[in-house]
């Protein structure tokens, strides 16, 4: 479970499946967008070998070379996405989920009809440019993790009940059931209607808002990849404080002009101080003063049924690992845990088989990084919650499970 080098490139290719015409190519290096492009001959070869397999009824999903992992994915027999990553320790699970998020982002911006019934390639290329900012965020070193976990990134506000009550009242006053409050792409509070949004739009909408340049207000047309892939909705955003945005998903009404300053002030001025207290909750998902063990460097908590997660890095006197390294280590550990120790729930056929041959499901696992690092990672699952911790080298190995269990019990009332 290595830590990739600073300049490890990732390339994403999007092609029309029938013709092989490239629609776009996006790249990143060291987590930042890059202008580096793959030669057309390489693009043609990667698409050609995939099409060759399809003609022989062979499904080519992934391949590995000495230093690169390649994953192919075809969507609706119309769009082919290919991702190449030279990052050390990159898993196929991460790349597969990235491709699903990328296609979801494309549907979110241009709609499914434009992607499955391509009439004009050049026009589609231009329309897809609006999705580049969102797509590039999947290639970089994001502070979010919903693209990998397929859970909504959340934070826990200090006065959550008051915010929830105000949000519900505001939603009723504006006549829309889908309202949320976001800080840096994470959900602070949301109405029941917003929480009922399907995947992937439940993850994509906050991620989209977090990837856009700051604006006081927006009226943004979006399609819902799961709920409404062919009919657009309106995503209205209003900035309450810098970095803190109110989002409404609605139809033709209300018009943006109806959300005037007087209406906003009436609902949100009484909560000004609690709103300000939410601003630091971007990088740290937990309210200030929440008791966590001093050895905890970072954590990921998932509610597997609600599809929500908390992803936070804790302040530490130690300079190493950096917050970016901690996020990367936890992301890599999650892919290991999800593919090896805590796989997704089995389907009906698998459950039937399990009744005959019951399998033992693990409750916890841990990993010690080395040599010379000593950082420890532990995962524990209790019921519908899964907790992953990154711990300092000072933590005794025999106490990892106990510490993780106590931490999970303390966090359970929050998520």
Swiss-Prot record:
InterPro entries: FUZ/MON1/HPS1_longin_1, FUZ/MON1/HPS1_longin_2, FUZ/MON1/HPS1_longin_3, Fuzzy. GO terms for cellular component: cilium; cytoplasm; cytoskeleton. Disruption phenotype: Embryonically lethal. Embryos display severe developmental defects, including neural tube closure defects, abnormal patterning of the spinal cord and the limb buds. They display polydactyly on all limbs and defects in skeletal development and organogenesis, including malformed sternum, ribs and long bones, as well as severely hypoplastic lungs and conotruncal defects. The number of hair follicles is also reduced. Defects in ciliogenesis are clearly noticed and result in abnormal hedgehog/smoothened signaling. Keywords: Cell projection, Cilium biogenesis/degradation, Cytoplasm, Cytoskeleton, Developmental protein, Protein transport, Transport. It is found in: Cytoplasm; Cytoplasm, Cytoskeleton; Cytoplasm, Cytoskeleton, Cilium basal body. GO terms for molecular function: phosphatidylinositol binding. Expressed in dermal and epidermal cells. It comes from the Eukaryota. GO terms for biological process: anterior/posterior pattern specification; aorta development; cardiac septum development; cilium assembly; coronary vasculature development; embryonic body morphogenesis; embryonic digit morphogenesis; embryonic neurocranium morphogenesis. Component of the CPLANE (ciliogenesis and planar polarity effectors) complex, composed of INTU, FUZ and WDPCP. Interacts with CPLANE1. Interacts with CPLANE2. Belongs to the fuzzy family. This is Protein fuzzy homolog. It comes from Mus musculus. The lineage of its organism: Eukaryota, Metazoa, Chordata, Craniata, Vertebrata.
